[in-house]
């Protein structure tokens, strides 16, 4: 079963003014779509791999044939990362988490503000292209960043919040002002979705 581009859970202009309509359209229909197309192309001659989930492929890259390993890493990672990214954004987002996730953030980072600062630093400090992440690792929250389209899944960690800091994610609106894009991100985080992913990751 070939992988498919997921539909966005909101219109392309829904995240304005924080992320502009044109960026969302190009990011979803061109960039993400290309990762899906190239992932399917890499798996084409390998029917034994076509029934595996994205998580199964990415968590065990070493088991893949060397000839397609890099293509699956880059394009499978890109597909996984963006599929998560769209769901943790919402036009009704922002604010702060509540409940179990809020408690875990306060316990691990001291406060929500301290968490935001550390996450923002990880995003701003990622040289070149990549992602900043809040992950669950052995039941614990952790902030990390990955280069290119690498996914925390490749390291055995479960991502629950991610921020794309590739220039294609923000350049049309913010140009080289990555910190402004990072600051705007907090206005559209869907904390209900992040909390749901946190509960699921803890139950693994």
Curated annotation (Swiss-Prot):
One short Pfam family name for this protein? Sod_Fe_C
Q: Which domain of life is it from?
A: Bacteria
Q: Name one GO molecular function term.
A: metal ion binding
InterPro entries with a match to the protein in the record: Mn/Fe_SOD, Mn/Fe_SOD_BS, Mn/Fe_SOD_C, Mn/Fe_SOD_N, Mn/Fe_SOD_N_sf, SOD_C_sf
Q: Report whether Transmembrane helix shows up as a keyword of the record.
A: no
What intrachain disulfides are recorded? none
tRNA-binding as a keyword of this entry, yes or no, is no
User: What is the required cofactor set for this protein?
Assistant: Mn(2+)
The top EC class, named as a word, is: oxidoreductase
Q: Which PANTHER family match?
A: 37S RIBOSOMAL PROTEIN S26, MITOCHONDRIAL, SMALL RIBOSOMAL SUBUNIT PROTEIN MS42
Q: What is this protein called?
A: Superoxide dismutase [Mn]
Organism annotation: Bacillus caldotenax
